[in-house]
């Protein structure tokens, strides 16, 4: 088995255990157990909803054992629908604190859900795709209208580029914000070859940025 596929196989149950699969719960589909399960937080970290990306890849690679395909598809569906419930009115989502309006996490969740749509194309109905696009459209709108306010953080900006480029591809849109964000990355790139992360180079972040 491919080493990356093996890692996915070894961790898929851990990923599945994040999600609230009680369809009678108000937090059905939420992925932050500290919020929906242990109740030690008063907000849900939206980053974890992005696990649908990995679940869709795992489904495509057929690495699930002991699970019906329909069950995995419903976990993914509930997690994507939950994004709508945890999104703010301005289209943003949070990671670290209420009202965060996180550019990076909003872009990341948009990219991950859109990636799931891409990988599951043949398993989704037209109505499902339209519903998912309706959920992600406000997130794309947020990262179109707002920037990364903390600093020049190239990996955050690159996440926005990836999200909008994939949105344009799947939703047949012509949003040019991806090119604007990419230009900011290039304008702040070092002559030594590294991309700016806050005040300098960061090999770890550069790995994520170039991915």
Q: Which role does the model predict for each range below?
A:
Residues 1-47, 70, 74-85:
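Low-complexity, Ser/Thr/Pro/Gly-enriched N-terminal "stalk/linker" regions
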């Amino acid at each position: 088995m491919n080493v990356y596929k093996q890692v996915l196989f070894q961790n898929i149950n851990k990923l599945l255990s994040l999600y609230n699969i009680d369809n009678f719960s108000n937090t059905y589909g939420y992925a932050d157990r500290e919020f929906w399960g242990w109740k030690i937080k008063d907000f849900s970290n939206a980053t974890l909803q992005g696990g649908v990306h990995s679940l869709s890849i795992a489904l495509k690679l057929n690495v699930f054992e002991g699970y019906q395909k329909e069950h995995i598809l419903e976990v993914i569906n509930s997690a994507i629908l939950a994004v709508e419930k945890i999104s703010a009115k301005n289209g943003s989502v949070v990671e670290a604190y209420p009202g965060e309006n996180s550019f990076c996490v909003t872009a990341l969740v948009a990219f991950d859900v859109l990636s799931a749509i891409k990988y599951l194309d043949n398993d989704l109905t037209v109505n499902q795709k339209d519903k998912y696009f309706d959920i992600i459209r406000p997130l794309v709108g947020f990262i179109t209208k707002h920037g990364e306010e903390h600093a020049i953080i190239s990996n955050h900006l690159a996440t926005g580029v990836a999200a909008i480029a994939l949105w344009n591809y799947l939703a047949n849109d012509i949003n040019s914000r991806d090119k604007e964000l990419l230009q900011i990355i290039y304008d702040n790139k070092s002559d030594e070859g590294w991309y700016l992360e806050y005040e300098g180079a960061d090999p770890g972040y550069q790995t994520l940025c170039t991915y």
